[in-house]
């Protein structure tokens, strides 16, 4: 047999789940325990004391003659009256006995013989027989026959509900218990509930929750202009229990001290007593991450809500079923029953009168059970009314938003909303504290505090370095925000912020008087009004790297004193079919615009800065640039770079740029440059870069571009150099590296102003003597060719500082290299074995590039 405690354990849940048990569930749990006690009590009584007692219904005296027990044909049917003897004992006491005879319970002896035997045995009683009245009737049944009849009538005459009521009540109660707590046991919902309760308890006990709510209280007091006097200490409650459930009852109340924090309002000074330590901050940040992931996981489905509705419907249907059939059996339970077991051949009687000793008790227990189940059912109906009266799959934190400064707490839905509704039935303070961890403002404030703890002024100072321009530079990468101490580095020149999505630039940036360059790499920084005013007046160079054009901060287009703007990102993605740059009209002093993107046309907004723009760079990452009409309006552009734009010819719009000085068309698909003759109208053009294309020949018309000083044709498919190139008397730099050129024309000697010649990666085998007439050469790169010997006239290049010979067929170097006084070992690129062929004094002269300056100093 089981105990009450063992069965009641079906109704037990983890103590931490009690926050998800509204009052009706708790009440129904107690009612289920009472019903369980009724069922077990009734079952115990029935097993121990349930009994049916039956007596045969004897024929009446008037009909006794017609009654003859089977098997005794000679038995007299007259039922004699029972005699009572009252003999006196020796002490004078009188006893009353009923004279049944010794054969009264012997069915095989005829009644007449029994009476005759009695008369012969007790002759003295015969004279008193007529004077006494009969007090009972004989049945002639044996004890075993009574037991047999009792068992037969218990199963035949007794209603089934009287026999099985305790067991049915027990089964029904167990089903109700299981139905009430099934959502706590079902694996797919149990895991979510367990996770939710764990997070909820941690959020309730978190010092950050206490701090945040304290800030809210402080803000309310500020708004109401209520002065708080006295220094009150905000207690910080940290749970040391291993249980991750609901918070302890000893959680301290929240004092109205701290600082005011609002997403839209300035933050007042933070008292040191409310600052979280590093451990508390890390725990709070972990909670924000857990809440975010849990919300994303639970909001996807409404399984918990549906399961709770289903189990409530099951309990309601169970209540209706129990009430319907039990009400019909209340009157069926009675004390007396008539039994006709059809065992006349065994007992001699056909009808028996029986009594059920547990009838009154069972009837009272049944009425009690029905009363309890009615109360249980009404609560189920109320639960259904509550479930369908309000939208439980939506939960609004509107009240919390009104009472606190966290106006960004989002509304939730589905199972997440349902769980919060259930928690509100327990205590609304849980949801209020939980909402703090749904607020991005709260999370950002926590990150800001933790960030300022970690990145102190001293630590930031250690990360300051000097860049190639000898400027002090600070690079911050993948932080949760910009530390406040950054703005105390007043001597900083360059600030780089990379992958800081929540970057905010406060008014303190106005202290950084030396700051002129700012880098925002995937960092849509927000600025305060005072900070914007400072940047607008002082910032000179801005680099913005983005994935989508929406990441470009709007204030970028309002920096009126900006000189250089670098935009690197996708301006023509699927989400941005049209160019997304805003108007650049406010950039009144912009001189350099660098755009690295995937444009299909030159943005028309660029014309807003046309009057003062001097340099335009477009790196298109292989996307074909189709429309360049806007270039015609860039009349003051001196430098133009169109790289990786898949251009097949030189755009005609370029020929309208009368002030153009440098043109770079690197990494396109240009094959012919017949339009080069049009460059003669660009009187100021001095540098032409057509490198990394597919050009197979340089047209003779290049001779008309007489002002060219630099010409780059490297990484093309040139097989020869036309004589016209050498008519450019102002040419100072000629780069034809990595082509298929096999000979250098002797006309190269005409380039008297040539200072840099690059022929690396060709098929040149002989160097013409006229080359060495270019006495102003400083750089001569001849590597990776087929040159077999270096002429001794190399000595004429007295200004040579760099000579590349590596990758040729040379077997020795001429000693005349020593006469190139400006050439040093660092500028000579050659194999080590070739360098060793030089005379010792030449090698020593070449090695003096390091020692000579120090020697002169000494």
Curated annotation (Swiss-Prot):
Residue ranges, annotated region (Disordered): 118-137, 221-251
Subunit details: Heterohexamer; oligomerizes with other LRRC8 proteins (LRRC8A, LRRC8B, LRRC8C and/or LRRC8E) to form a heterohexamer. In vivo, the subunit composition may depend primarily on expression levels, and heterooligomeric channels containing various proportions of the different LRRC8 proteins may coexist.
UniProt name for this protein: Volume-regulated anion channel subunit LRRC8D
Residues with Phosphoserine modification: 241-242, 246
Keyword Disulfide bond tagged: yes
A GO term for molecular function: volume-sensitive anion channel activity
Transmembrane portions of the chain: 23-48, 164-182, 309-330, 361-386
Membrane topology summary: Multi-pass membrane protein
Superkingdom of the source species: Eukaryota
Taxon lineage: Eukaryota, Metazoa, Chordata, Craniata, Vertebrata
LRR repeats: 514-534, 538-559, 561-582, 589-609, 612-632, 636-657, 659-680, 684-705, 707-728, 730-751, 753-774, 776-797, 799-820
Family recorded in the similarity comment: Belongs to the LRRC8 family.
Extracellular topological domain residue ranges: 49-163, 331-360
Keyword set, alphabetical order: Cell membrane, Disulfide bond, Endoplasmic reticulum, Ion channel, Ion transport, Leucine-rich repeat, Membrane, Phosphoprotein, Repeat, Transmembrane, Transmembrane helix, Transport
């Amino acid at each position: 047999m089981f105990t009450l405690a063992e069965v009641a354990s079906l109704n037990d849940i983890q103590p931490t789940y009690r926050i998800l048990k509204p009052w009706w569930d708790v009440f129904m749990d107690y009612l289920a325990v009472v019903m369980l006690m009724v069922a077990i009590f009734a079952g115990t009584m029935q097993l121990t004391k349930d009994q049916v007692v039956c007596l045969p219904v004897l024929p009446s005296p008037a009909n006794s003659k017609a009654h003859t027990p089977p098997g005794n044909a000679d038995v007299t049917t007259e039922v004699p009256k029972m005699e009572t003897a009252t003999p006196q004992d020796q002490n004078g006491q009188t006893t009353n006995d009923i004279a049944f005879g010794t054969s009264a319970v012997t069915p095989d002896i005829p009644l007449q013989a029994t009476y005759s035997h009695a008369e012969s045995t007790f002759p003295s009683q015969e004279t008193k027989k007529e004077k006494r009245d009969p007090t009972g009737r004989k049945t002639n049944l044996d004890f075993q026959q009574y037991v047999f009849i009792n068992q037969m009538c218990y199963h035949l005459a007794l209603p089934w509900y009287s026999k099985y009521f305790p067991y049915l009540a027990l089964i029904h109660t167990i089903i109700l218990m299981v139905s009430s707590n099934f959502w706590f046991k079902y694996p797919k919902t149990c895991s979510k509930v367990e996770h939710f309760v764990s997070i909820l308890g941690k959020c309730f006990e978190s010092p950050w929750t206490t701090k945040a709510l304290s800030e809210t209280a402080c803000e309310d007091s500020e708004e109401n202009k209520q002065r708080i006097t006295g220094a009150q200490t905000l207690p910080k409650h940290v749970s040391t229990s291993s249980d991750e459930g609901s918070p302890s009852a000893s959680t301290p109340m929240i004092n109205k001290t701290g600082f005011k924090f609002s997403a839209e309002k300035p933050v007042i000074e933070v008292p040191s007593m409310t600052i979280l330590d590093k451990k508390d901050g890390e725990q709070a940040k972990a909670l924000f991450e857990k809440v975010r992931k849990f919300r994303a996981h639970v909001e996807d489905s409404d399984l918990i809500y549906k399961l709770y509705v289903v189990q409530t419907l099951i309990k309601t249907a169970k209540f209706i079923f129990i009430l319907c059939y039990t009400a019909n059996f209340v009157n069926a339970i009675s004390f007396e029953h008539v039994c006709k077991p059809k065992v006349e051949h065994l007992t001699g009687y056909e009808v028996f009168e029986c009594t059920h000793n547990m009838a009154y008790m069972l009837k009272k227990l049944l009425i009690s059970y029905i009363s309890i189940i009615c109360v249980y059912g009404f609560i189920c109906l109320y639960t259904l009314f509550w479930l369908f009266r309000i939208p439980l799959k939506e939960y609004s934190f509107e009240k919390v938003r009104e009472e606190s400064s966290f106006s960004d707490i989002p509304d939730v839905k589905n199972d997440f909303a349902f769980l919060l509704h259930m928690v509100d039935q327990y205590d609304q303070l849980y949801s209020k504290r939980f909402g703090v961890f749904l607020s991005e403002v709260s999370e950002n404030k926590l990150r800001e505090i933790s960030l300022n703890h970690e990145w102190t002024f001293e630590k930031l100072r250690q990360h300051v370095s000097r860049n190639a321009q000898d400027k002090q530079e600070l690079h911050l990468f993948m932080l949760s925000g910009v530390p406040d101490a950054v703005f105390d580095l007043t001597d900083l020149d360059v600030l780089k912020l990379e992958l800081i999505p929540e970057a905010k630039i406060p008014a303190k940036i106005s202290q950084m008087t030396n700051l002129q360059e700012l880098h925002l790499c995937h960092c849509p920084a927000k600025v305060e009004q005072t900070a914007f005013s400072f940047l607008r007046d002082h910032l000179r160079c801005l680099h913005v790297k983005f994935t989508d054009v929406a990441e470009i901060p709007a204030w970028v287009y309002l920096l009126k004193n900006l000189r250089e703007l670098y935009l690197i990102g996708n301006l023509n993605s699927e989400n941005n079919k049209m160019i997304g740059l805003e108007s650049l009209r406010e950039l009144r002093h912009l001189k350099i615009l660098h755009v690295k993107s995937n444009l299909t046309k030159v943005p028309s907004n660029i014309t807003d800065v046309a009057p003062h723009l001097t340099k335009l760079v477009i790196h298109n990452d292989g996307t074909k640039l189709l429309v360049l009409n806007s270039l015609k309006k860039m009349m003051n552009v001196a430098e133009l770079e169109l790289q990786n734009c898949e251009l097949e010819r030189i755009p005609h719009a370029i020929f309208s740029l009368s002030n153009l000085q440098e043109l770079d068309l690197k990494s396109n698909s240009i094959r012919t440059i017949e339009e080069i003759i049009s460059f003669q109208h660009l009187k100021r053009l001095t540098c032409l870069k057509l490198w990394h294309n597919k050009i197979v020949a340089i047209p003779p018309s290049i001779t008309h571009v007489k002002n060219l000083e630099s010409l780059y044709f490297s990484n093309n498919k040139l097989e020869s150099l036309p004589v016209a190139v050498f008519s450019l008397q102002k040419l100072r730099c000629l780069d034809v590296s990595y082509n298929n050129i096999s000979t250098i024309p002797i006309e190269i000697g005409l380039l008297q102003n040539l200072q840099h010649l690059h022929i690396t990666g060709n098929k040149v085998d002989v160097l013409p003597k006229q080359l060495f007439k270019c006495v102003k050469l400083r750089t001569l790169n001849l590597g990776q060719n087929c040159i077999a010997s270096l002429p001794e006239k190399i000595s004429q290049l007295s200004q040579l500082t760099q000579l590349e010979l590596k990758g040729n067929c040379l077997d020795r170097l001429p000693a005349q290299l020593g006469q190139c006084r400006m050439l040093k070992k660092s500028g000579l690129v050659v194999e080590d074995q070739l360098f060793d062929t030089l005379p010792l004094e030449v090698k020593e002269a070449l090695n003096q590039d390091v020692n000579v300056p120090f020697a002169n100093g000494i």
